[in-house]
Regions:
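Preference for solvent-exposed, low-hydrophobicity sequence contexts
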Residues: 3-7
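SAM cofactor-binding core of SAM-dependent methyltransferases
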Residues: 12-128, 141
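Conserved acidic-Pro-Pro-aromatic motif
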Residues: 39-41, 51-66, 77-78, 134-259
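A short acidic, often aromatic-flanked loop/helix-cap motif at beta-alpha or helix-coil junctions
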Residues: 124-129, 203-207
Length: 259
């Protein structure tokens, strides 16, 4: 079972909305923040910006800033080769998969003007030009929606996130290998003004021997900017019609909490 502190605070269901696809890359947020967000910052991009695209449709006035050092020219060359081989081996016959071969065109079209992708690694303290600190990313920005999926490095940037909470309206964060880092997550949840309003187990990474997910997606709301119940949620997770599996060939993970 997951620790009691992993159970979200009570939300009015009509305030919860899913943004992005009904699969991996979609997240549940509080819709009250949408129109108030001025900057959406994504740390960790890979080849998926569907969340950012849909968010921009709802709030066309916000800027999108993405940081990912792995998405470079080499990344796109390798991806195109792989997709092309799959196509000729008849592994990409569905229209969506065929269109994915030309994902780079979508990337070029999306990341322009107010939408920017920086080929930099997100770190606690930068040591060279290829890195950028989370503190610098957040500097001089207000009304932020911060989305973090940096494959285990999220634990290194929790402290500056906690200290700069006043500028962050909503935090979406994926915690990896949670059982090895459970105390770090608990400490962050206890001391942060960003309060947990939603949790989902990412079924891509499977479960441990106790049937708990190895990776969780958490959504946290700034409790000083938005009204939030002091009571814990009574929802069963995953929430029907809000949560969807990341990997369609596996069942979603039912979450259980220590009460």
């Amino acid at each position: 079972m997951l620790p009691k502190i992993f159970k979200p605070y009570k939300s009015i269901k009509k305030n919860l909305i899913r943004v992005g696809p009904n699969t991996d890359g979609g997240y549940v947020i509080d819709k009250r923040v949408i129109k108030k967000v001025k900057t959406l910052i994504s740390c960790g991009l890979n080849d998926d910006w569907e969340f950012e695209k849909e968010f921009l449709k709802i709030n066309p006035y916000c800027e999108i800033l993405a940081y990912d050092h792995t998405v470079n020219k080499k990344f796109w060359k390798n991806r195109f080769k792989k997709d092309l081989i799959s196509f000729f081996l008849l592994k990409k016959l569905r229209l969506r998969k065929i269109l994915n071969i030309f994902k780079y065109i979508d990337y070029i079209n999306f990341f322009k003007k107010n939408n920017k992708h920086y080929i930099k690694k997100v770190v606690l303290k930068s040591k060279n030009k290829k890195e950028i600190s989370i503190k610098k990313i957040l500097k001089n920005k207000k009304n932020i929606l911060l989305k973090i999926d940096i494959e285990g490095d999220e634990y290194k940037v929790l402290e500056p996130i906690k200290k700069n909470f006043q500028h962050i309206y909503l935090l979406i964060i994926e915690f990896h290998n949670i059982h090895k880092n459970i105390d770090k997550i608990k400490k962050f949840l206890m001391k942060s003004k960003l309060k947990l309003i939603h949790i989902h187990g990412n079924n891509y990474s499977g479960i441990n021997k106790n049937k708990d997910p190895n990776v969780v997606e958490m959504t946290m709301l700034n409790s000083e900017k938005f009204k939030l119940s002091k009571n814990k949620s009574k929802f069963k997770y995953p929430i029907k019609d809000l949560d969807y599996v990341n990997f369609k060939r596996r069942n979603d993970i039912e979450l259980r909490f220590n009460d």
